[in-house]
């Protein structure tokens, strides 16, 4: 456990950040699951609409440092390729 005042503060901040990041990560995964479900259903219109929603979200999460920018690019590319193949 933290002994100094500054260490206690940092522990509180780290826990607050962890919870905030967990919430964002959960939201990101939910939007990705919606996109995957639309692709698997073969509904091109719904999949395209889901891609339009998830693309800026992935970019935002990469900018905030929640995921790496290459991971965001990889997901966007794979979603777009899967939708194009429908």
From Swiss-Prot:
GO terms for molecular function: small ribosomal subunit rRNA binding; structural constituent of ribosome. GO terms for cellular component: cytosol; small ribosomal subunit. Disulfide bonds: none annotated. The keyword Cytoplasm does not apply. Keywords: Ribonucleoprotein, Ribosomal protein, RNA-binding, rRNA-binding. Residues 1-27 are annotated as: Disordered. GO terms for biological process: translation. Pfam families: Ribosomal_S20p (PF01649). InterPro entries: Ribosomal_bS20 (IPR002583), Ribosomal_bS20_sf (IPR036510). Belongs to the bacterial ribosomal protein bS20 family. Binds directly to 16S ribosomal RNA. This is Small ribosomal subunit protein bS20. It comes from Vibrio atlanticus (strain LGP32). The lineage of its organism: Bacteria, Pseudomonadati, Pseudomonadota, Gammaproteobacteria, Vibrionales.
């Amino acid at each position: 456990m933290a002994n100094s005042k500054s260490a206690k503060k940092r522990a509180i901040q780290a826990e607050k950040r962890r919870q905030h990041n967990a919430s964002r990560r959960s939201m990101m995964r939910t939007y990705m699951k919606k996109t995957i479900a639309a692709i698997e259903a073969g509904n091109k219109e719904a999949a395209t609409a889901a891609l339009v929603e998830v693309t800026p979200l992935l970019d935002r999460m990469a900018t905030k440092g929640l995921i790496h920018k290459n991971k965001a690019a990889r997901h966007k590319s794979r979603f777009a390729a899967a939708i194009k193949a429908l």
